[in-house]
């Protein structure tokens, strides 16, 4: 079992730019981005979420800014607006901001333009969280040239675990060998009945060190899809803050659902 023992006291690591990836869609990747962003924000960090899934915008709804968006990532990369025009502050927390994806993809994003943008944003935010499209190609290329670390989001089922392993291998081919695992939608009673894979088997199957485990909580995506706030003491936010601290190099015991 590949427990993450690399983050110990006195060994902080540079994890300012995080790429949230997944081998397949439907694993709750964007929800995890918002939760991790809130976990960072609650710890006093200034956070920027950047959504790359052109044509499938969703963060605007989850962050409660759908009615306020004028400019998006496509506008920014094409030079139609400044960074200050594209960055939107979320009402969920004053430290939480976002640049949302284009509603349609007019032209493929240029990797060099994306890299210049991310490099320019590093000095303005404590954490940049890149919400990548599902799949192996485009996501791994952007992560490889911009991110300090990639998080691989999976659910505990064999298909998702196999695709997560492919994502880990693809990231390494792109030169990003620092990746960690987030297991989402874990339901204890399903684990007991062996309907879902054992968490040890998930970790070994993906081949990435475990960073955090999030429970199956149907109300979370429902609330976030309406831009509704979560209480600061909600269990998933405690998990998100623990993940945030581990990313900062603190030795924090894994928080389980």
Regions picked out by a protein language model, each given a short descriptive name:
Residues 16-82:
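Walker A/P-loop NTP-binding active-site region of P-loop NTPases
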Residues 224-240:
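C-terminal boundary of histidine-terminating zinc-finger modules
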Residues 162-176:
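Conserved C-terminal guanine-recognition region of P-loop GTPase G domains, centered on the G4
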Residues 23, 155-156, 181-193, 213-220:
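G-domain G4 guanine-recognition motif of GTPases
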Residues 52-123, 220-229:
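P-loop/Walker-type NTP enzyme "switch/lid" segment
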Residues 137-158:
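Inter-motif core of Ras-like GTPase G domains
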Residues 200-229:
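Beta-strand-loop-alpha "switch" segments that mediate conformational coupling across diverse proteins
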